[in-house]
Each structure stands twice: as structure tokens, then as C-alpha cells.
């Protein structure tokens, strides 16, 4: 059960008849641990061999320092199982290439990860950059097509605008005139026109003064008679009497003020 080899005297072999683990990592070693004639020897020492995960628990080996960078496979991971170990002894070049392939497949390095991340970034940037370029090109193309209009159509549009402006100006002038003259409600004017005040004539004022001296307050029937006789409206007669009463009141207040002083 305990198998001693020139490399590791304290190595404990497996219960099954598998190939020694040293032959899985060193292509120039035979199954029994001896070197193949005609091949160069790998530079390793007993401390490197004792850093294997299945030999680290051996009592005869002392735990050594961490493995060098070139032995990435000795990091505690179990190597792949080869049922037929004959290809390891066939040729050094073939075994070396296959070992490196298995190693790169089982234990991908950081460089491989960074390369894959860089490729993904390039693909992402390519896709989105292309989409962005396409979007900008579409926008530029649309702006260019909008800018390159037919000159005839532009002249036609300008001509219609120029033709419409005189019509609009004449219509606005007409609207202003009608608003000032007639007070048409359909024209939207800010200043609401007021009906021109029609002054009272001297005969009308004389008749109204006589009626006021007789009676300051008149009823509706009397107002109607005055409006018909003087050719005035009821509103005009009513307003005149109101103003005349206020005038009389002011005169009385002024007389009282003068009498005090």
C-alpha cells in the first residue's frame, strides 16, 4: 500500500491501480517515477513535490512555501483522470501540448479572462457604436433632406405668405375702421368704442330747466311726455334730472360753506 519512489519516499499510493500523480504533471517521467532516456530533466526539488495536495498530509514531508507561478496546477484542484496513460509516454511534445491544453481548460488564467472581457467590451461597443452612428446618420440625413428643399416649393410658399399678408393687412384696417365708425361687435378690438355723446340743444335745455323748477322729481309718465316732445330718450331725460339735482346740491353746500366764513 505504501509505495516509495526516488522522488517521494513517504508517498502513499492509491488503493486502485491508477497511474502515479507525478506522471500526470511531468511528461518526461514514467509511471514508476524514473526519467525517460533521451529527454531533459525538469528542474524540481523535493520541496516542490511535497507541495502536492495529496502529499501535503504526509508525515515525512514538511509543508513548503507556496508553489511558484509556473506550477498553477498545484493549487489544490484535482487534475483530470486519464484512464489510459499511454499517451503520456508516447512523445514529449504531444504529452506536453495535451497537458497544457488540459491545464488551460481546467484552470483558465487571469489573462484569458481579461482577453474575454476585452472581446465582450469590443463587441458591445461595436454594436452600440454602430447603432449610435446609424442613429446620428439618420438624424443628419433627415436634417439634410429637410434643408435641401425644392427652390420652387420654397418660392411658392413665400409667395403665398406674401400674398396673404396684404389681404390680412387690408382686412385688419377694415376691421379697425368699422370698429371706430360702427362699433361692430364681431371685430376683436381691445378698446371698446363708446357711442358719441349727443349734446342737448338750447331749446331742450330751456324746456328741461322749466320742468325742473316746477318739479325736481318726475314720474315715468311725465318723463315719457318730455322725451316725446323734446325728441329725446327716456334715459337721457332721467340722467339730466339726476345731474341737475346733484348740481343743485353742490351749490347749496357751497353757499353754506361761504355763509360760515
Curated annotation (Swiss-Prot):
Which Pfam family would be a valid example here?
Answer: Homeodomain
PROSITE patterns from the UniProt entry? HOMEOBOX_1, HOMEOBOX_2
Question: Which SUPFAM superfamilies does this UniProt record tie to the protein?
Answer: Homeodomain-like
| SMART domains associated with the record | HOX
Residue ranges, compositional bias (Basic and acidic residues) = 112-122
Specify where the region named Disordered lies, as residue ranges.
106-158
Q: Which protein, by its recorded name, is this? A: Homeobox protein Hox-D12a
Q: What is the lineage of its organism?
A: Eukaryota, Metazoa, Chordata, Craniata, Vertebrata
Amino acid at each position: 500500500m505504501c509505495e516509495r519512489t526516488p522522488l517521494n519516499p513517504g508517498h502513499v499510493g492509491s488503493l486502485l491501480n491508477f497511474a502515479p500523480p507525478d506522471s500526470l504533471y511531468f511528461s518526461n517521467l514514467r509511471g514508476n517515477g524514473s526519467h525517460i532516456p533521451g529527454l531533459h530533466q525538469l528542474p524540481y526539488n523535493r520541496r516542490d513535490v511535497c507541495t502536492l495536495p495529496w502529499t501535503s498530509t504526509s508525515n515525512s514531508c514538511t509543508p513548503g512555501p507556496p508553489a511558484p507561478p509556473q506550477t498553477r496546477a498545484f493549487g489544490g484542484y484535482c487534475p483530470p483522470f486519464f484512464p489510459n496513460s499511454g499517451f503520456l509516454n508516447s512523445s514529449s511534445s504531444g504529452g506536453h501540448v495535451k497537458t497544457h491544453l488540459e491545464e488551460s481548460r481546467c484552470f483558465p488564467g487571469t489573462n484569458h479572462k481579461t482577453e474575454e472581457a476585452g472581446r465582450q467590451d469590443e463587441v458591445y461597443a461595436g454594436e452600440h457604436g454602430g447603432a449610435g452612428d446609424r442613429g446620428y446618420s439618420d438624424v443628419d440625413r433627415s436634417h439634410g433632406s429637410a434643408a435641401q428643399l425644392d427652390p420652387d416649393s420654397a418660392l411658392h410658399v413665400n409667395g403665398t405668405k406674401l400674398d396673404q399678408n396684404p389681404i390680412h393687412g387690408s382686412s385688419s384696417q377694415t376691421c379697425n375702421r368699422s370698429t371706430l365708425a360702427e362699433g361692430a361687435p364681431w371685430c376683436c378690438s381691445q378698446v371698446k368704442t363708446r357711442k358719441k355723446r349727443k349734446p342737448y340743444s338750447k331749446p331742450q335745455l330751456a324746456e328741461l330747466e322749466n320742468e325742473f323748477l316746477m318739479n325736481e322729481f318726475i314720474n315715468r309718465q311725465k318723463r315719457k311726455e318730455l322725451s316725446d316732445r323734446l325728441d329725446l330718450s327716456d334715459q337721457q331725460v332721467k340722467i339730466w334730472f339726476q345731474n341737475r339735482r346733484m348740481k343743485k346740491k353742490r351749490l347749496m353746500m357751497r353757499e353754506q360753506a361761504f355763509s360760515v366764513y
